[in-house]
């Protein structure tokens, strides 16, 4: 079988995300400097930066009406309106790469998790492009005042972050994709604990989900990295002057080599293959973030379990 990326109109029938409880505290916003106007201008000379909440990088797109109708359009509209107000009052958001978003069919968005902006910016951007992914998010978010109910109405898939739940989470995620719906995940599982807010160690569930859903569909499910940077320095009590926030929606991963021989895997994706795909995602996220920040990424990565920097 040739493991090429799934065509945009694919539909179908039929490691671990891990229980990651909070550990330590994220570093304060003073730990990083704001994203400067000069750096945004430098990025704009290389990439086509757009307002992801209002602009279409390649012209207006045909919305996926089936997804929209299935995901409470009235609640979605209200949430987007609220997010738009917050984003515009607190920041100046730009993005590149949204032309990569498929108009139809399943795909996976693996997003960074520096701040809550890493939730809202990709969400609003994909909604504006006419897609309605399901979101894997910690179950506690459903209990948040006011917006918790909205999260459930607009596609949140609650994640019970307890031991023994990983397989169920992965199976639910695979079923979402094999039904033809897109899925968004945050592989770090919680806000990064890296003192300088680089991507940290990730659970290999994103690798399991991508590989298993591709095996069941018989084609490589498109997998994209969404990297957001700039919100870490925002003071939410007094956000002015507004800070720059930039998101990159990267081109699709090619992980066909990891699908070789998948018919002989048995009931589970080999751990080494899920680990390798997850590692590639982390490395790529770090490369993109380094470009957005205009900085050299530190060697290695921050390990959540040991709360220290380790070698790759």
Positions of the model-derived regions?
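Non-catalytic C-terminal accessory region of glycerolipid acyltransferases
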Residues: 3, 13-54, 58-60, 167-312
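Helix-to-loop junction immediately C-terminal to a conserved catalytic motif
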Residues: 82-113
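Catalytic core of membrane glycerolipid acyltransferases/transacylases, capturing the structured
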Residues: 101-163
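Residues at the C-termini of beta-strands that transition into short coil/loop
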Residues: 99, 139, 160-162, 227, ...
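A conditional alpha-helix N-cap/helix-loop micro-motif detector
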Residues: 91, 140, 163-167, 203
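Structural motif corresponding to alpha-helix initiation and N-cap regions
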Residues: 95-98, 144, 167-170
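Helix-enriched interaction subdomains in cytosolic or periplasmic regions
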Residues: 65-79
